[in-house]
From Swiss-Prot:
Its EC number is 3.4.16.4. It is a single-pass membrane protein. One of its GO terms (biological process) is peptidoglycan biosynthetic process. The chain crosses the membrane at residues 22-42. This is Peptidoglycan D,D-transpeptidase FtsI. SUPFAM superfamilies: beta-lactamase/transpeptidase-like, Penicillin binding protein dimerisation domain. It catalyses: Preferential cleavage: (Ac)2-L-Lys-D-Ala-|-D-Ala. Also transpeptidation of peptidyl-alanyl moieties that are N-acyl substituents of D-alanine.
Length: 579
């Protein structure tokens, strides 16, 4: 009986123990499931955004799809500015600083040498950005060097594709074309003025990668917007001629600088625009800042004798003078100021006034016409008004806003003092004269159709003055050295004193020659400006006229323009022997 009771008790105790263990295990499982459920709820609901963000940070990548900057080309399609693919050498400091014995590693030494960055300086830069995952070590590295660096397989060093501008014509078109900064943004010249047109919009795509860098999902794509190429009106063959001859002229005359502009009369297109001294836009680290400026649109000067044809055209139109009129050109006084010429002439014809560049003669003609008519003629030719060529930095010039004009004001205005123009405005003036009085907008962009214009003066009067201007490059004229063998050229030379920083005239000069060729059927207008010639001669007829002749001779030959005056060849040969 006792054994039965004992067995029953032990059996009951065993069952209770098993039940207790069962319930304990059950409770543990239930508690675990409860905790897991809470954790799932926490992860899926409460902390889901953080987890998604963390996962995306590890797997999502946004890749830029570069849009190559548009090319700048000349009218024939020759490249003036192109984009070449290069690489940026980048570093991830967070990875590099985990690497041991970096400074003693030969591959790091090789990187230092190929980038010309001292190893100590490189690691000072890396250490100063310890928490960064991206810094630049070098930019715009050519593909050969980039490939070498890639083969070094340095931890934390990687390549980033980027672009660089290259300018094939270097100094020849530097001030006009300009350049971009290291990020491809135009900061000078055409590059700056047409930056929006040349710049496309980069695209981007969002992808998901696995831990080995393989693309496992393409999430989104924003297509890049293509950039535009730009075809300028410039002809690089003519631009090269103009630049080389201008450079030589600046050197011979010992001028501070020189500017030359060539215009296609029929279309108003700028075929060449050159400055000297220049710079190499492919190496902007070593440029002289004053040489960057495009003086054709930024610099102002008093046009001097180059405006005298305007006065003659207006006087002929008003009937104040006739083609065969004779003018008394003896010196005279206005308000205690003497008006005189460089060389004395008692009387001159209208042609003689232009040929000898008589200040006295043109002053007397200007004084005989209504003031408003004189001013209006200058305004019609665009003096003191921007050309609206589209180039950033173009100056307006200066036309005096006087309500009352004294006789002295009128006299000095007639020979180009008291107003300021840019070289481009002067080029437009002579382009208008060459078009027989048609005021046509200039263009730096290639045009496929003839540009319309406005007839601002009757052609018959303008043609008469062009014929008179031919005498300037003939024996007895101040611009004899501007003559071109075999061609009739209509020119006007000039010399003006420069204004100093205190607003007074100083003993420095601007010499210029502006002209048209061939005079029988004008095709081109050309202006040459030399700033502060410091040689023995400084007059326009002596320093800028030869540059005009050299350039125009080569231009007419290059463009296969038929000679229209074979009779002047002997005259030029004799003149050259005398000089």
């Amino acid at each position: 009986m006792y054994k039965k009771e004992k067995n029953r008790f032990l059996k009951s105790k065993q069952i209770n123990y098993i039940n207790w263990r069962f319930f304990l295990l059950y409770g543990f499982i239930f508690l675990s499931l409860f905790i897991l459920t809470l954790r799932v709820i926490f992860l899926q609901i409460i902390s889901s955004n953080r987890l998604i963000t963390e996962g995306d940070r590890r797997t999502l990548r946004t890749q830029s799809l570069l849009s190559t900057r548009g090319a700048i080309k000349d009218r024939r399609g020759y490249p003036l500015a192109v984009t070449v693919l290069v690489n940026a050498i980048c570093a991830d400091p967070s990875v590099i600083l985990k690497t041991k014995n970096i400074k003693n590693h030969k591959r790091w030494q090789a990187l230092s040498e190929i980038l010309s960055i001292p190893l100590k300086k490189m690691f000072l830069r890396i250490n100063s950005h310890k928490k960064s995952k991206f810094i630049y070590l070098a930019r715009q590295i050519n593909p050969e060097i980039s490939e070498y660096i890639k083969k070094l397989q340095l931890p934390g060093i990687f390549l980033l594709e980027e672009s660089k501008r290259y300018y094939p014509f270097k100094e020849i078109s530097a001030q006009l074309v300009g350049f971009t900064n290291i990020d491809g943004i135009g900061i000078e010249g055409i590059e700056k003025s047409f930056d929006l047109l040349l710049t496309g919009k980069p695209g981007k795509r969002k992808i998901r990668q696995d831990n080995k860098g393989h693309v496992i999902e393409k999430i989104s794509l924003v297509h890049k917007r293509a950039s535009n190429n730009l075809n300028l009106s410039i002809d690089t063959k003519l631009q090269t001629i103009v630049y080389n001859e201008l450079q030589e002229g600046v050197k011979k005359s010992q001028s501070d600088s020189g500017t030359a502009i060539l215009i296609n009369i029929k279309s108003g297109e700028v075929l060449a625009m050159a400055n000297s001294p220049s710079y190499n836009p492919n190496n902007i680290r070593h440029i002289i800042q004053k040489n960057v400026r495009n003086k054709a649109i930024t610099d102002l000067f008093e046009p001097g004798s180059t405006v005298k044809p305007i006065v003659i055209i207006e006087a002929l139109k008003l009937g104040i003078i006739q083609e065969n009129s004779i003018i008394d050109t003896k010196p005279f006084l206005i308000q205690k100021h003497q008006i005189k010429d460089v060389s004395y002439h008692e009387k001159l014809t209208i042609t003689g006034i232009l040929q000898k560049s008589s200040n006295v003669g043109v002053s007397k003609i200007a004084l005989s016409m209504p003031t408003l008519k004189l001013l209006d003629s200058y305004i019609k030719f665009g003096l003191g008004k921007p050309t609206q060529l589209g180039l950033i930095g173009e100056k307006h010039g200066f036309f005096p806003p006087k309500k009352r004009w004294s006789n002295l004001d009128k006299a000095t205005l007639s020979f180009g003092y008291g107003l300021m123009v840019t070289p481009l405005q002067l080029a437009r003036l002579y382009s208008t004269i060459a078009s027989y009085g048609i005021y046509r907008p200039l263009s730096i962009i290639k045009t496929d159709r003839p540009t319309g214009g406005k007839q601002i003066f009757p052609p018959k009067y303008v043609k008469k003055v062009i014929n008179m201007m031919e005498s300037v490059s003939q024996p007895g004229g101040g611009g004899l050295q501007a003559a071109v063998r075999g061609y009739r050229v209509a020119v006007k030379t000039g010399t003006a004193k420069k204004v100093g920083i205190h607003g007074r005239y100083i003993k420095k000069y601007t010499a210029y020659t502006a002209g048209i060729a061939p005079a029988s059927d004008p095709r081109f207008s050309l202006i040459i400006i030399l700033d502060n010639p410091q040689g023995k001669k400084y007059y326009g007829g002596a320093v800028s006229a030869p540059v005009f002749s050299n350039i125009m001779k080569l231009i007419l030959k290059k463009m296969n323009i038929k000679p229209d005056n074979l009779s002047n060849q002997k005259m030029i040969l004799k003149s050259n022997k005398r000089n």
